[in-house]
From Swiss-Prot:
Residues at the active site: 22 (charge relay system), 67 (charge relay system), 251 (charge relay system)
Top-level taxon: Bacteria
Gene symbol of the encoding locus: uox
Reaction catalysed by this enzyme: urate + O2 + H2O = 5-hydroxyisourate + H2O2
Protein family: Belongs to the uricase family.
EC number: 1.7.3.3
Record protein name field: Uricase
Amino acid sequence: MTATAETSTGTKVVLGQNQYGKAEVRLVKVTRNTARHEIQDLNVTSQLRGDFEAAHTAGDNAHVVATDTQKNTVYAFARDGFATTEEFLLRLGKHFTEGFDWVTGGRWAAQQFFWDRINDHDHAFSRNKSEVRTAVLEISGSEQAIVAGIEGLTVLKSTGSEFHGFPRDKYTTLQETTDRILATDVSARWRYNTVEVDFDAVYASVRGLLLKAFAETHSLALQQTMYEMGRAVIETHPEIDEIKMSLPNKHHFLVDLQPFGQDNPNEVFYAADRPYGLIEATIQREGSRADHPIWSNIAGFC
């Protein structure tokens, strides 16, 4: 039951949507059952939803599973090992929703950081900063939804990109070009229509498809390249209903070398830090759900 409070002005106030938990639990799991060790490096967030009204309206903590308990559960479950980040989140979600009657759902998210072996060494690694793998699990009653993703994957094409035919007005100074550098930091999230997935294999496949489409599409606009990247994923993976992407256009401007008596045949550029174009889109399977609630808690995507 929802409690209603009435203020001195007669305004009625009720508790709306809410969730709580422990954010960014730093977890490093070393699997050392052989001489060749494996590293899993995660940043895990656990947030619960359910009957927590009394905690908000009366300070009654009878239903409040402490955020410290949620943190401890992450570490305790890691001791048992896990194959993929998504499977780890599914186990956490199952534990909290089945272990506490008043917890009807929640949100569990993780970032996964990669480590590469140093010269194929058994237990020495260097941090791979080329990308971060992401995963979000949302449970609402009996429904489960997973969004996986990749962020910070920086890519560049030194040719094979054009930009022309755009509107011009009195504020337009950008020159048209038929040969430019195209560079971006790929951030992509894709929503599965099932949780029965080989998550590692699909992640590797999606990553490869995104890179292949970026490399092979002769680009007339970053929007076109983005669409081709998303289309390749949707056409290849029936278990994915939609993919959202956010691609900043990392501008590279040709430097004028004429003051120094030199030409510049598209070889010397200034890499601009900001401002930058920001291109975002959703590419989805026709007929699939376009407004899944899991996206309401994933910022930065249209």
